[in-house]
């Protein structure tokens, strides 16, 4: 009873809190917060509800009871039922379904004597059976949950007891908010708790979150600032602080609050300090934390909402037709009621036909008709298929089973199959019309290879590295005898290169099987326990093709000039080193430290490498270098005090600096490089780790300096280090820096150590890590430089963002400003070249801050960090105040190769009639190049580019493009405008006109505005493919939502990262790709695959099968019920519409419930109208599902008409056969039931395209079960069901030849029209499905010839249509050559304007010129004929 009260109290509080949780009392007063100061006792105004956590110890006993005593304990209960409430609650839930309520109404109605049609108990049978089956299923499910809950609640953990003053064993269910918990390695965390102590020297705790979000890579959590420096374990009795944090919520990536000490000093808390329930402690000996959320208020439980429920398009169509069946039922019942009233009115005075009531009262015909209406409702209730929905669920489970059992979906490398997370929308896979795809990790492998870089305005091609990649690829191809016909490399798809670089690619970097990308195995542990295991997904970034980087010879020469002498005093004068040298040093330092890479030992990948501090190292000549770095920084800084050449006095006390706040120090979100191709929202990304390989050891000895690079005493060499990165981009940059002996040696929460060639080990004090977010699109690290002792900000991000944050340089300014402007212009040119080669680009920049500037920023940043409400906004504002007036150092180009089979899959999906949109965070040139490489765009496509700076210009440019497209197809009668029909594309599929649209993120923002949405959708409907570049996660979801809601089409979104989650959830079907980017996309998806190529078979084969199977099965159910119910309806015309049945009630009930239920289920699971091989070879067949050809509205009515015809035959053939005989009512009904059974079963045989022995076995079993039941029932039931008496009827009929003749004749006549129609359809006017079905019966040679003929006819139709389209044009323009895959952007056109004048046209539109004037300014190209 206590548990029930607590459960009710919990839900009541949740209900009350839900109404007030989001109520804000007003905007956050940031200026008042600034005035509070660091140790001010003034509490900022907090909006909404917050939680105060007081430690569960003796000194806080009264306060604990006041605050924490009201919170729920850690007991969980996921069950819905108890022994007392199971029956009423389960029935209550089941009667939420309209169908169950309908049949319950019929049961109640049958208990009314005036309208009773059946024996009362019989009417209840179907409903009772359905309710019982579902109740048993729910009960078993709930009992399983109960056992799991009991097991979890009784787990043991160490909890501090305030009475015994020590840690004691307690069950999880007894843990409360405020308890101190001590956990050891490999223990599961029992509740959400703030980390106060870790045995790790750096205050780090490693956790595995696979039980929470599916990710198996380890994550790091940080001890609360101020407790990490303690040498001993935290003593709960000495803990005198309290915690104030936000109310419980389900956001795994957010935790806001602060810890307030007894002296009112506050320390900000973030998700980096929170250990979540369900995670496991790894590689940490022991941790101590205080519980802040327990039980059902933990984030894990709040996220445990189960799979999302989606209703498929086919199910919505079936629900509509059920309503039509209800209308048909009402019409039939009204007919029976009117007929009964008319019949009684004719015999009103003849008591033989109109039997009076027991009191002698005669019921009027009108009232009798009213009663008969309800009697007919009961009699004809089978018209509404109660078993339809149960059968649909069974069929869907069978379909899902076969999808997951398909061996073609198995990924040997990842040991994964396709996951079907949504069980009720498999049929929607066969009706997809629009596909929205992410790029990185979805279309590409997300395995990054460092290819090129630009430093200080000089481009370094790394030609030797390119040759190495080629040789590596060729070696793999030779070993595997694998000939790749499609290029997997994006860099070789581009023709233009920098002037100083020569083309080194003689052939494509072909794709290779993914299981050869992992490299060799490595050894975990040592000694006897060591075992050799293959690389898993956590260590995927381990192939030599990814880890090895061959240095560029020109850059290598410049590195060799970097020596300590360059910075040492010479003849009492300081020689300024070349500015390019300083750029190179900072560039590679930024590559090495501007990340969150964790350095590990290869034999123990999870153990970090730590080095002694810089102060204890015998490093020579560094003191002399400091002054020069300071002077260089002075020249570059924009601070007035630094411009004067004076070193500012530190305004930050040592104690203040030592307590630097952690801004997501150890595990920020996926770094900025993710934005380069996709803007990432979530901080959780998959791990990529790798160790040095033999190839790198060979290149590692290349002399960057005149002397040898020495490692620290007792520390491993650079090639013995293992890097664990959150994304492959980070690891690629760190390995690139290591190739130039700028080696990341170690990383702790307080410092980063880099071994920089001749300069020796450099230890940077790590002040802050500002993680990546989708708004800033960059990440930064704030460090104190060991040489200059200045605060330096290193930033990396997308060029579109970094270029806007650079310090403004005037052409008339100082020489340094001019040089920076030149560097910026050259770097931008290099970035464009990289993007045209399909490389992912990043900009690297830095900023030097004075201590005064840093102290001011730090003060404001601390206040933002310790706020609870609006923390994200305040931290964003703080980061943007820091990341400005940057100095550009250079840029990088990283190659991300296409996945195996992507071009073929996209080509097949295009042929299937699916319009594909690529939504990416990449820049325009990169996105277009990759679109050509994966065959999303074809070389002869007409390419239109939307890249404007204003809304008006966007609208005018779209209008111009639409006019150009309309000119091309003005003679085509099939053209349809958007206002007429949004569902059909304006351009016929075989018109020969192929167009592609490229739109940037800024322009997309304009296009998504309500005033331009219709115009934008009309433009995209003309295009076969659309590429949205520089798109944010929010824009991705808005695009999907716009297309889905306005065009009323079936959409599918596929992605692999956290930035794709919103898009995946908005689409009709969301598919997650399990790869390098974690499991967020998979957890949010309806289906999960391991590679994009699996999508083609999932849609073209299984999607087609699921849709056609379920469509035909649903239609068959409607047909079967209408055909059988009409037998009862026709009989009413011969019994005075009295509501009498000519068959026994038991047979009537079991006809649908037992005799004819199994065959359609087997049909729905096993039917194959076309083989998988043919469906893959002929993707065009998929269009039948897009058009819903298997289940159209007229198909439903034709099916019902056929059912009416068959019921007429089934009734009147036996009627005329036995007319004039002395056959009684039940003897007449027996041949009707038997013939009806044969008709409905053989009807299914006619409709089946692939009969197997299972089909035949089930059909024969259904027939035998009917005869067996009829014989046994007729022999045993004499008067068990009055007034019917089926005694010995079947036995008599089975001895009568007329019975067999009637059954055969009735079945033949009833099925003859459908059989003749199917025969004529297959021979005279076969559909594409039937023509393709013929291929399955051909020999391999005949099949090959037939496929060539099919494809040849299709190409001939396209060519004919294309030439007709060209001849129909009035402009007579000469066709422009389509952009090639070699140089995608060269001949891309917009509004038929040459690429060279495109930007001028857009600029004119942006400046407000009219459309005509803009194109006049664009040059003479407007008049060219294309």
Swiss-Prot record:
Residue stretches spanning the membrane: 98-118, 122-142, 322-342, 366-386, 1114-1134, 1146-1166, 1196-1216, 1225-1245, 1253-1273, 1293-1313
Record topological domains on the Cytoplasmic side: 1-97, 143-321, 387-1113, 1167-1195, 1246-1252, 1314-1426
UniProt-reported outcome of changing residue 215 to Q: Impairs ATPase flippase activity
Single GO molecular function: ATP hydrolysis activity
GO biological process: monoatomic cation transport; monoatomic ion transmembrane transport; phospholipid translocation
Family (UniProt): Belongs to the cation transport ATPase (P-type) (TC 3.A.3) family. Type IV subfamily.
Protein name, per record: Phospholipid-transporting ATPase VD
Lineage: Eukaryota, Metazoa, Chordata, Craniata, Vertebrata
Gene: ATP10D
